[in-house]
């Protein structure tokens, strides 16, 4: 078959396959056109679930006679004219495909009148070439679109329509979503001559909750928490149901709008779900009606045929913004106090450790304790320094302090006789700055290492905590602060505020920058190791810790933070283990020479080898 240009009707029918899925799709496209035309009242008449008739009447600006024929042509629109317009769309429609596609699979009639015309005009397209006929008609200012016999000329598509009740329920849901997007528009919906829905316009400054209750039900309204959250060009408004009262019925209420456009966006849903996860069960879903306003240049709506999805240019920023907005209103409603009492603190949020392989956990012990001899004896050059004492040593072991510590560890201790080397210790007691080669991951969080024929197990979570403490502890210069895209604002008591002000200089050395006013504190920057943490939980716990202290030493604060950071790895991979050990060897060379308890355990394979040889 030779290459040829498709006839207009066939081309439009192909496009209709994407745009017109069912009668509800037609209603959505036509009502959005009415909203773009500035309508304040829209009447929707449906017969037989939309298969027989869909009539949309509005009081918008109307269409001029000269433009009626173009309105039914494909890729004809008044909403964009250049690429710049496409990259900053503010209208609901913009492709110019809807009317042409709908008219190709139905008998469509368009009647319209503008305010400066004396009479109305009616247009309809028919025939193989979709020729448009225009004739005079009687009609007030505005537009009426009638769609008769949907899919009459595509029997295969018509066969897939569901029952009349099911199709109307889909239309009803579309109108609910649109009514929640535009409180300023009156929308009436009727089916088979009976009025089903009447959504009256809410005057400016009026009670939007009345329409919210009519659409989402009184149960949602009773447990709805209002959200008003803003940062830069981002604004989040709306309501989220209290997760403590979420039911399967309420969980069906998940409406999200981006610049007034109804969306089904996984990124937004994930941010909301993450904010509510501590209050929801594994099989529960949050209920919400949220409106996100964003600079049109920062969002691409031209990524889905039916415009159900969008793509954000700064998706991480949008995700964190929504997450913090929802979490903030939930915390304000719950009024969770900061941990200032004498109740026992929760255990550090880390993955379970292989205690048999890792030995004692120094981070689970008090910061001040008697020195404990290291699991591996240090080399003579180390001066016999107890390994368990240097986590509290000052200054800390930042990257720039590595050379200083190497010199300290290599300073010979006077009047000390060298020890006879033990069989399995030269690999760690020598001057080498490497743990060895990673062979595999054992028990999900331990690395099996080999060096010079000696095998050992290394507890990766413990190594990760030592590394974080090294990264957090300031040396000659303060730790580099990383500004937050969205500053974290928390309510604090007078005691907490006083403790923060006393610890401000110490926190600044750790890279934590904040500003306090009245009853609130705003965290503006944190060090790099804290960027991927849940700051909504960690920072209040840190404030609670500081409120109990009388002396604020950066090293002690860094050690507390390192103990309470959440591990980023539930299941370690070889690549992650190799990267971690490389960082530890670079920033904490002392761990290689003098491994602290709980970090490294030698594995003696000789008995197993001997047993195999004896068989």
Swiss-Prot record:
MF annotations from Gene Ontology: ATP binding; ATP hydrolysis activity; ATP-dependent DNA damage sensor activity; mismatched DNA binding
Q: Which UniProt keywords apply?
A: DNA damage, DNA repair
User: Which residue stretches belong to region Disordered?
Assistant: 362-397
Q: Which SMART domains match?
A: DNA_mis_repair (SM01340), MutL_C (SM00853)
The family database entries (InterPro entries) matched by this protein are listed as: DNA_mismatch_repair_CS, DNA_mismatch_repair_MutL, DNA_mismatch_S5_2-like, HATPase_C_sf, MutL/Mlh/PMS, MutL/Mlh/Pms-like, MutL_C, MutL_C_dimsub
The Gene Ontology biological process annotation of the record reads:
mismatch repair
Where is the sequence biased in composition, kind Low complexity? 378-391
Entry's Gene Ontology cellular component terms: mismatch repair complex
Q: Which domain of life is it from?
A: Bacteria
Q: Which NCBIfam families match?
A: mutl, PRK00095.1-1
Biological function: This protein is involved in the repair of mismatches in DNA. It is required for dam-dependent methyl-directed DNA mismatch repair. May act as a 'molecular matchmaker', a protein that promotes the formation of a stable complex between two or more DNA-binding proteins in an ATP-dependent manner without itself being part of a final effector complex.
The family assignment reads:
Belongs to the DNA mismatch repair MutL/HexB family.
Supply the name of the protein. DNA mismatch repair protein MutL
| Species this protein is from | Escherichia fergusonii (strain ATCC 35469 / DSM 13698 / CCUG 18766 / IAM 14443 / JCM 21226 / LMG 7866 / NBRC 102419 / NCTC 12128 / CDC 0568-73)
Gene encoding this polypeptide? mutL
């Amino acid at each position: 078959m030779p290459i040829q240009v498709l006839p207009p009707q066939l081309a439009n029918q192909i496009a209709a396959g994407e745009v017109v899925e069912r009668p509800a799709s037609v209603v959505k496209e036509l009502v959005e056109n009415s909203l773009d035309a500035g309508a304040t009242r829209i009447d929707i008449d449906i017969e037989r679930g939309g298969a027989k008739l869909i009539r949309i009447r509005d009081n918008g600006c109307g269409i001029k006679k000269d433009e009626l024929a173009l309105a039914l042509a494909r890729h004809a629109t008044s909403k964009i004219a250049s690429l710049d317009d496409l990259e900053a769309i503010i209208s609901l429609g913009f492709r110019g495909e809807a009317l042409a596609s709908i008219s190709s699979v139905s008998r469509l009639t368009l009647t319209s009148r503008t305010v400066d015309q004396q009479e109305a005009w009616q247009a309809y397209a028919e025939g193989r070439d979709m020729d448009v006929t225009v004739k005079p008609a009687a009609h007030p200012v505005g537009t009426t679109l009638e769609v008769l016999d949907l899919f009459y000329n595509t029997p295969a598509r018509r066969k897939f329509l569901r029952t009349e009740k099911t199709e109307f329920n889909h239309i009803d849901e579309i109108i609910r979503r649109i009514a929640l997007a535009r409180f300023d528009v009156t929308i009436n919906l009727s089916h088979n001559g009976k009025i089903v829905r009447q959504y009256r316009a809410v005057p400016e400054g009026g009670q939007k909750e009345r329409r919210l209750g009519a659409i989402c039900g009184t149960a949602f309204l009773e447990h709805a928490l209002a959200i008003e959250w803003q940062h830069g060009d981002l604004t989040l408004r709306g309501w989220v149901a209290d997760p403590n009262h979420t039911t399967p019925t309420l969980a069906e209420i998940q409406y999200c709008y981006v610049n007034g456009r109804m969306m089904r966006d996984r990124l937004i849903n994930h941010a909301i779900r993450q904010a509510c996860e501590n209050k929801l069960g594994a099989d529960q879903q949050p209920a919400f009606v949220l409106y996100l306003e964003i600079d049109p240049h920062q969002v691409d709506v031209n990524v889905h045929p039916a415009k159900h999805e969008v793509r954000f240019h700064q998706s991480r920023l949008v995700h964190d913004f929504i997450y913090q907005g929802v979490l903030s209103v939930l915390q304000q409603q719950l009024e969770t106090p900061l941990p200032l009492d004498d109740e026992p603190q929760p255990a550090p949020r880390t993955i379970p450790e292989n205690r048999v392989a890792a030995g004692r956990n120094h981070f689970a012990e008090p910061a001040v304790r008697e020195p404990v001899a290291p699991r591996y004896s240090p080399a003579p050059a180390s001066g016999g320094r107890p390994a368990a004492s240097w986590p509290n040593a000052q200054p800390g072991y930042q990257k720039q302090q590595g050379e200083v510590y190497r010199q300290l560890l290599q300073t010979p201790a006077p009047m000390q006789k060298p020890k006879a080397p033990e069989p399995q210790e030269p690999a760690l007691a020598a001057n080498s700055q490497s743990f060895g080669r990673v062979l595999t991951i054992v028990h999900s969080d331990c690395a099996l290492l080999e060096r010079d024929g000696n095998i050992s197990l290394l507890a990766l979570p413990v190594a990760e905590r030592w590394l974080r403490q090294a990264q957090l502890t300031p040396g000659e210069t303060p730790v580099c602060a990383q500004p937050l895209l969205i500053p974290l604002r928390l309510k604090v008591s007078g005691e907490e505020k006083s403790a923060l002000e006393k610890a401000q200089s110490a926190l600044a050395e750790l890279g934590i920058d904040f500003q306090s006013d009245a009853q609130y504190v705003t965290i503006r920057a944190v060090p790099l190791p804290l960027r991927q943490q849940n700051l909504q939980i960690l920072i209040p716990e840190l404030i609670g810790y500081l409120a109990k202290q009388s002396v604020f030493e950066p090293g002690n604060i860094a050690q507390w933070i390192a103990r309470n950071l959440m591990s980023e790895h539930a299941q370690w991979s070889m690549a992650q283990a190799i990267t971690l050990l490389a960082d530890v060897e670079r920033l904490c060379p002392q761990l290689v020479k003098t491994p602290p308890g709980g970090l490294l355990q030698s594995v003696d394979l000789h008995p197993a080898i001997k047993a195999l040889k004896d068989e």
